[in-house]
């Protein structure tokens, strides 16, 4: 009887204490800004111990939770929460490929490319054979942020880790082109064309078509840039525009006067100094839908 009474009293005390603790926690919670409520992911060091060796299981659990709840928070803090969450997930399971991919996808929605690249760099360092993470980060840099230097960095990593995939060389060549490195881009396209000149597969034909288009375009861009630079140098030196392009060669401003990829001379407007190509590449007409 006494034992039963003691047990009941103990339960009553525990209940009273828990109610009091709950009230204190609720009161404390009310003092936090709305965006900080109901969110706490422990540190990676803590979870590595608390997981009792089941790190992959806890990484999966936190990953599933993060997909459901991350968008409930204000933009001012949401991305820091998100980055912390995926930092913890990938600390628990560094090979969790989907965590890097989904984390970067969510971060890109708020255009937090700085955090996208931090998470991508972590994944690439911890997974030295993984090329998809580099490709993934490069696509955000190229297509969304339009940071072609950053895109080039990741596409080159992807191509180095998976040299047998010509599509990655295509991306490297395009990143060089959009960054303004026409000579490097031209070199890549020429290599691609040479590698696939006899490839009759659909992909091989596409790469040859793409290479032809870009070789034509880049050759023209390089020529026009070279001629325009010579025209500008002539104008600054002589105080007037040259009478014609041939005078640039005669007076030492150009070694030779290039022709366009079709072998035709470039056009020159004496009044404005503008230099243009008279045979733009009709790529659609030459290669149908390509």
Where are the regions a protein language model picked out?
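Low-complexity, acidic interaction segments enriched in glycine
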Residues: 109, 122, 187, 201-290
């Amino acid at each position: 009887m006494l034992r039963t009474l003691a047990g009941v009293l103990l339960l009553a005390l525990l209940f009273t204490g828990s109610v009091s603790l709950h009230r204190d926690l609720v009161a404390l919670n009310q003092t936090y800004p709305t965006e900080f409520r109901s969110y706490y992911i422990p540190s990676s060091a803590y979870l590595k111990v608390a997981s009792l060796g089941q790190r992959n299981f806890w990484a999966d659990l936190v990953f599933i939770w993060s997909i459901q709840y991350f968008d409930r928070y204000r933009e001012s803090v949401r991305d820091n929460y998100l980055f912390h969450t995926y930092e913890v997930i990938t600390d628990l399971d560094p090979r969790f490929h989907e965590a890097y991919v989904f984390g970067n996808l969510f971060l890109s929605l708020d255009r937090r490319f700085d955090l996208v690249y931090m998470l991508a760099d972590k994944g690439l360092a911890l997974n030295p054979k993984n090329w998809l993470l580099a490709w993934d980060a490069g696509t955000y840099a190229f297509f969304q942020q339009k940071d072609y230097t950053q895109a080039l960095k990741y596409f080159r990593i992807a191509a180095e880790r998976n040299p047998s995939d010509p599509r990655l060389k295509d991306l490297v060549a395009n990143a060089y082109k959009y960054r303004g490195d026409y000579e490097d881009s031209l070199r890549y396209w020429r290599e691609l064309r040479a590698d696939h000149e006899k490839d009759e597969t659909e992909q091989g034909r596409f790469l040859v078509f793409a290479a032809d288009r870009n070789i034509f375009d880049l050759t023209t861009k390089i020529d026009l840039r070279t001629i325009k630079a010579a025209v500008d140098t002539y104008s600054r030196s002589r105080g007037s525009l040259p009478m014609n392009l041939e005078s640039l060669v005669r007076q030492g401003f150009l070694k030779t006067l290039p022709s366009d990829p079709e072998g035709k001379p470039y056009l020159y407007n004496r009044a404005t100094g503008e230099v243009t190509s008279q045979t733009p590449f009709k790529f659609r007409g030459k290669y149908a839908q390509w």
